Amino acid sequence: MLYTIKHRVSGAVLFSLGCGSFKLCVEAAVKSGADLRDANLGGACLRGADLGGAYLGGADLRGADLR
């Protein structure tokens, strides 16, 4: 399935990837060095995701599962 991470205000595509889950898409974005400032990650299930090194300034993380 194709997952897309979009800018929270403009809706511009920041990163997209065909993979098994949105969590894997976010991890791949972080690993590739994608700029995730102002990303719309609200409500995402990111439980156990490796976000080390990610810059998420201004990102919408409301309701995201980050445990």
Give names to the regions the model predicted.
Residues 1-60, 65-67:
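Extended, small-residue-rich solenoid/repeat segments and analogous flexible loops
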